[in-house]
Amino acid sequence: MIIDNKTTTIRDDFNNDFKVEYNLIKTNVDDNIIYGFSVNTTNMSDNTNLYKEFLDFTKDLEYAKEIFEKLMENLVLPLNLVNVLDEIIN
């Protein structure tokens, strides 16, 4: 279930505009609540989509919210979601 969502538009080095949607996700796994993230981009010129999710991240909602804000601040794209999460949490 999506519990928070933010959307922005970014432009790459080739002047392509991308709509980027960030989701904070709550999942029940074996009666445990786990929080994770998904990032979805849509290329505005050709409507191609790229989607990546990382669901099994933390049980701590406040920590998940903090990381969610950092994803948005750093304009993280689906291709580098896992790598950026590794950098943020280390």
Residue ranges, per PLM feature:
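Negatively charged, low-complexity tracts enriched in Asp/Glu with abundant Ser/Thr
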Residues: 1-23
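Generic marker of residues within folded, mature protein domains
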Residues: 12-14, 27, 54
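A positively charged, amphipathic N-terminal helix/segment that binds anionic biomolecules
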Residues: 18-29, 82
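A short, structured beta-strand/loop element
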Residues: 29-52
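Mixed-charge, Lys/Arg-enriched low-complexity segments
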Residues: 45-90
